[in-house]
Amino acid sequence: MNWELYSSPLRVFWRSKVWDEKTSTFTSDENLKIGKMVGKRRRPRPKRSIDLEDSTEQLISGDMVTFPCSVCYRELNKARNFLHKKHHNALSMLGFQWMGGRQPKPKLVSLHRECIISNLLRSSTYNEKVLHNVNYAFEFLWKKQVPSYFKLCDKVGETSTYSPNSNHLMIKGIAICSNNNSAWKAEPNCKFTVVNDFGDKANVCFFGLFDSHYGYAAADLASKEFQVLLLHQLSIQDPSYQMTAEQKQLINSFDTVFREEYRAREEAFSSTYKTFRTSRREYEDTHKAFAKAFWRMDRLLRLGRNETSRVRWSGCSALTCILEGGIKNPHANKDWEKTYQQGSTSLPFQKTPQIISGVLHLANAGNVQAVLCRNGKGFCLTKEHSTRNTKERRRVLYSEAVISSDDPYGLLDGHIKTTRGLGFHGNLRLKKSIIPAPQTISVPIDDLCQFLILATNGLWQVLDKKEVTALVITLFHAYKETHVPRPKSKPWPPIGLLSPPDSNIRVLFQYQPENEDIMSTADGTKGLSDSIYAEAYTHQGTFSPKVTPYDPCSTKENSSLPTIDSKQENEKELCIKNFYKGAAEYIGCELVSAAIEGGSRDSITVMVMFLNGSEYHRLT
């Protein structure tokens, strides 16, 4: 497969011993040097046998897995990522450009430092922290040894893994991996939630991450009660969402909190949002439900339940998602599959029914972010609400808040970087700036969408979306090579039969688009129409008997007796599920390890979710 055809910056390599045994086809300086030393004989080294256990040990160590740096596109492994990023920061601080890995001359480094310090002392905006950063960068480039304050602690605790079962049509495997990063954090501060058949609806899954600040009470309550608040709002707008008796009792217990005057303010809050990039209004109610659920969850945290501090109560950043899936007009799809299996070589594309796999709704407030990989390209679906965001800085400064200079991007009132979230009611001045208004967005999910990554700030402060996407693809290749049995990649049709696949995603509905460069989007009129025929063709192997009970359009149950073919198909589906679940666990742990080795100073929680697109050649 030629990776350069669709994503040249995301070229990934996995250097194994088998590759080292092959002769390189590229001309290099090493080949020229070998040619000059023909007269010298070297004793041949005994070849070491390669077995599966040895390869798995190397795979687990992570040294053989590389990914490209998003700045210079140089191949890095996890161990080199930390110092490599420090090298980039030091060069940038002293005014140097990337020199292809070459070190600038010491005299030139000294001259740059003296010039920067001289200009800094003469300026009216003198900052002691900038002076320290210049000196640190100078020491990093001047000294051959790494300064002691750059080194990491070896013991960071164990990574816990949780793999919930999912019967969703579009989810192949899911895993949540978490590490407290005990070198910097004393206790765990992240909670997660995964709910299958959300609202008693098939192929509707709710999942979310809640990263706490100043304690775990807010994140713990939000992980338990937010889904109930959201389900209540959705059930009001759509009766197909059903609530259990226990959930209704919980909602009724909050009647004394949500009175009429509060509901009037809530309605005004949810109606002030502006729509963006869409004329499809059917998702507006879903986004209003998210907004009201965030507002109500923040009001419940104001009660101070389970809070232990008398000075400052806890808060949390939240990322919540609803994945709706299904097959449109499934009976027509089965007829088309039957016609194709009878030996027909021509495909009537004009009569092929349109298949829409599903829609992903997201709502985030804070610094928990999500990246969707579609056709080998990563898209950030969330917006970071922190002092790093220029518009967020402008908003909090307009609310008479103070941003200190204790951090490269400042701290809100000298305490925290986050500018939106749930809770933070202990400090009234801080709460005035930290609002529970979420950023919401809806995007279509089709068979070109390969995986979804949800992670807390501990991962994103070390790796960006391009590096995470490339690393996940590389790790998936490595896992596939060392684990047998593995599912076979489904064949793609000849290129001439299909339109060029669109690598972008289309925004179906979005509130408050304050950052235009957060995501690349296709033309609204074009959308996903280029890949409709590709979807119809690639679904030829997905119409198994197991899919029938989960079909939302079908009202009949499959009452036929199980056959040998159906049993084999069920065993095959179970094997595939186990494979993707294991891959999600392995990749999640490796992402956590990469963040820790990259110098993360926060706890890390990563949710890895493989979608239908991971079955095809674009990823496998």
UniProtKB/Swiss-Prot annotation:
Residue stretches making up the PPM-type phosphatase domain: 173-611
Gene3D superfamilies documented for this protein: PPM-type phosphatase domain
SMART domains according to UniProt: PP2Cc (SM00332)
Cross-referenced SUPFAM superfamilies: PP2C-like (SSF81606)
InterPro entries membership: PP2C, PPM-type-like_dom_sf, PPM-type_phosphatase-like_dom
Chain segments annotated as transmembrane: none
GO molecular function: protein serine/threonine phosphatase activity
CDD domains registered for this protein in UniProt: PP2Cc (cd00143)
A Pfam family the protein falls into: PP2C
Family: Belongs to the PP2C family.
Protein name: Protein phosphatase 2C-like domain-containing protein 1
Gene designation: Pp2d1
